[in-house]
Amino acid sequence: KLNKDNKYKTVFRKKSRSLASAFVRGITETSGDYIGWLDTNQSELAPKFNIMIKELETDSDIVIMSRYVSGGGDDRLLLRSLSSKYFNLFARLILRIPIKDLTNSIFLMKRKVLDEVTFLGYGHGEFFFEFLYNAYKKGYKIKEIPHLQKRDQNAQDSKSAPNLIRFFYYGVLYVLRIFSTILRRRN
């Protein structure tokens, strides 16, 4: 049950499937002090937003549910969980930031972050690590709290799981986005 003191707004989209476009729509339609999201296949995590709000009320600007901090984990198929873990390690090393889970995108943040941090609203999940990178470089405090990623109920739960070609396609897009993020930051 959600905390009655906090108000939540849910936006349902039926046509566009782009994660980045969902983010753009969400932030244009929201008016609260905190902005966050999670995919509908993870809606059981909504009550954890109350924990995230408490973190924001203390000393954090962005709170991420992370698979790669103590207490978190990844229960998906071995190929998916290992590739995600090693991609996050690779991204963290290349981007030189301490965030351990750059691709989970279950988060809550203070609205003020959007006043300074811009992002390019295209792509699948790769726009999120660019957003986190830019927020970190501007000095915003990012806190990760543990999250156990459950096994996908079916292949349609993931954009990358249905076949290996698609899996590697998204992997290449993510790697390209890492390097373009660095180049944009230098300009």
Regions found by a protein language model. Name each.
Residues K4, E57, Y136:
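Anion (oxyanion) recognition and catalysis
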Residues N41-S43:
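A short, conserved beta-strand element in the Rossmann-like catalytic core
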Residues G139-N187:
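C-terminal catalytic/acceptor-binding lobe
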Residues R13-E29, Y34, P47-G125, R151-V172:
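Acceptor/aglycone-binding surface of glycosyltransferases and processive sugar-polymer synthases
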Residues K1-V11:
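Acidic donor-binding segment of Leloir-type glycosyltransferases
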Residues K7, S31, D59, G139-K141:
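Short loop/turn motifs at secondary-structure junctions
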Residues I97-P98, G123, L132-K150:
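Catalytic donor-sugar/metal-binding loop of nucleotide-sugar-dependent glycosyltransferases
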